[in-house]
Amino acid sequence: MIPILYEDNHLLAVEKPANMPVQGDSSGDDDLLTLLKGYIKDKYNKPGDVYLGLVHRLDRPVGGAMVFARTSKAAARLSGQFSSHGAIKTYLAVAEGNAPGGELEGFILKDEATGSSALVPENTCGAKSARLTYAPIAYRKGRTLVRVSLHTGRHHQIRVQLAGAGYPLWGDQRYNRDARPGQQIALWA
């Protein structure tokens, strides 16, 4: 069962498990949105389809808190908060190296063919600006526990920007060439 963090008539906040897709994909694996629709349908004896608005996403390997809208009005308001940066998005991550903290700004381009993103020059066609701040919480064994605040929400942004700064996330199979198979990415929303 998916842990429920908060629930009312308008919102549903849950703890997304790591390695679960937020919505259905070609893998056919169970996805969070479908499971939560089933939860609402069963709990409230809802006939037919259940509305549940997806207003933000987390990468498949990342776990953490997610908010869903139970009404279209709530979906519009939440989407507005996310797009206007009214929603505060904070993450905990374990980065390789002794990350000093600070602000990272740059441009990210998503490669649709590979599903990866990369830091690129500002004038690159299709590139989007990306900004985050991060602060060290603790240092241990050549790694840093950091708190990351997103100011933009780009594809794989934290993973790409910290790796680009020389502090890839522990266990990140895509952007940390030293990650070992089977390691779980150390990133939590």
Task: Name each region found by the language model.
Residues 1-189:
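RNA pseudouridine synthases
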